[in-house]
Amino acid sequence: MTTAAFTPWILGLTGGIGSGKSAAAERFVELGVHLVDADQAARWVVEPGRPALASIVERFGPGVLLDDGQLDRAALRQLIFADPAQRQWLEALLHPLIGQEIFSYLAKAESPYAVYVSPLLIESGQYRKTQRVLVIDAPQALQMERTLQRDNTSPEQVQAILNAQLAREERLRHADDVVVNDRDLAALHEQIDRLHHFYLTLRGGQP
């Protein structure tokens, strides 16, 4: 992406489920960096009244709605991970809409650089719209452990998500920077702080 005067230098942040990318993202926010999360944008585009939600209900039926009209994400997740073709259809519907929301928001950034967080940064091709890719990496056993502690889900469902996500080796192949998050939160913060200073240097800001 060509960086114009009103367009920020964008860092793409990604990692598999349970890798700790959300904790890394929170640290960037604490450091004053403008950030948008693809998961947040994905919620925005399927709010009641938005066209994407109507398309999802038309395809999957009213069983994917909660009583208040909101999308039942757990029900939809079970449907798409049981059927790769359905997952591909959903991604084809949502990715362009999510991208529009994200880059419209990032264009308003006032920090020296901005962070775009997405678990599908590589798969969606949106890493091409960033200037640098940071991958948060963790051993798969630790990803499984963290996800089971955090979410009300089964080991089988977590494994299905891991299997559906991009292979770890392929994700790392696209990385400009890698943070191995296999210790505690303080260790993660230390690595993010160091990279933050580096990114400020790249942007000509003050470390």
UniProtKB/Swiss-Prot annotation:
Lineage start: Bacteria, Pseudomonadati, Pseudomonadota, Gammaproteobacteria, Pseudomonadales
Pfam families: CoaE (PF01121)
Entry's Gene Ontology cellular component terms: cytoplasm
Gene3D superfamilies: P-loop containing nucleotide triphosphate hydrolases (3.40.50.300)
Entry EC no(s): 2.7.1.24
Catalytic activity entry: 3'-dephospho-CoA + ATP = ADP + CoA + H(+)
Organism of this sequence: Pseudomonas putida (Arthrobacter siderocapsulatus)
SUPFAM superfamilies xref list: P-loop containing nucleoside triphosphate hydrolases (SSF52540)
DPCK domain boundaries: 10-207
Main localisation: cytoplasm
Keywords tagged on the record: ATP-binding, Coenzyme A biosynthesis, Cytoplasm, Kinase, Nucleotide-binding, Transferase
Residues annotated as binding ATP: G18, S19, G20, K21, S22, A23
Descriptive protein name: Dephospho-CoA kinase
Location of this chain's protein in the cell: Cytoplasm
Pathway: Cofactor biosynthesis; coenzyme A biosynthesis; CoA from (R)-pantothenate: step 5/5
GO BP terms in the entry: coenzyme A biosynthetic process
Its biological purpose: Catalyzes the phosphorylation of the 3'-hydroxyl group of dephosphocoenzyme A to form coenzyme A.
Similarity-based family: Belongs to the CoaE family.
